[in-house]
Amino acid sequence: MQSKEDFIEMRVPASAEYVSLIRLTLSGVFSRAGATYDDIEDAKIAVSEAVTNAVKHAYKENNNVGIINIYFEILEDKIKIVISDKGDSFDYETTKSKIGPYDKNENIDFLREGGLGLFLIESLMDEVTVYKESGVTISMTKYIKKEQVRNNGERVEIS
């Protein structure tokens, strides 16, 4: 029988090679918690984006040598995932101003590349908070029981 709260922690090198390991772990955690297939897939995309951003941007000044910490907190009605690094931070407001949503009439040949990670994370998860002190920490929550989801327009908090 599952306890009301479980906690799993991973610490991996900031390397793209470990994204698949993190995704596999996430699948197991979400499956054990009783999440739907769609919730598992949404969370895998969101976590992949957050980890890939850390791999690409956090340690670029340090020859991509660094560590990414991933925490899964499994609660009765939700799963909270925290991804953190100690690398370079970024200006959230500037980054956000450059991301979607895209205009459906926009010519696909002129769509800007990159910058979709935060947009995808916000779109796929129920709650998202970005902390920018001492690196970047992204906290995201996926509710397993959907009645818990807050119905608000802006779900990303910055602190």
Swiss-Prot record:
Gene3D superfamilies: Histidine kinase-like ATPase, C-terminal domain. GO terms for molecular function: ATP binding; protein serine kinase activity; protein serine/threonine kinase activity; sigma factor antagonist activity. Its EC number is 2.7.11.1. Disulfide bonds: none annotated. This is Serine-protein kinase RsbW. Negative regulator of sigma-B activity. Phosphorylates and inactivates its specific antagonist protein, RsbV. Upon phosphorylation of RsbV, RsbW is released and binds to sigma-B, thereby blocking its ability to form an RNA polymerase holoenzyme (E-sigma-B). It is an enzyme of class 2 (transferase). It comes from Staphylococcus aureus (strain MSSA476). NCBIfam families: PRK04069.1, rsbW_low_gc. The gene is rsbW. It holds the Pfam family HATPase_c_2. Belongs to the anti-sigma-factor family. It catalyses: L-seryl-[protein] + ATP = O-phospho-L-seryl-[protein] + ADP + H(+); L-threonyl-[protein] + ATP = O-phospho-L-threonyl-[protein] + ADP + H(+). Keywords: ATP-binding, Kinase, Nucleotide-binding, Serine/threonine-protein kinase, Transferase. InterPro entries: Anti-sigma-factor_SerPK (IPR050267), HATPase_C_sf (IPR036890), RsbW (IPR010193).
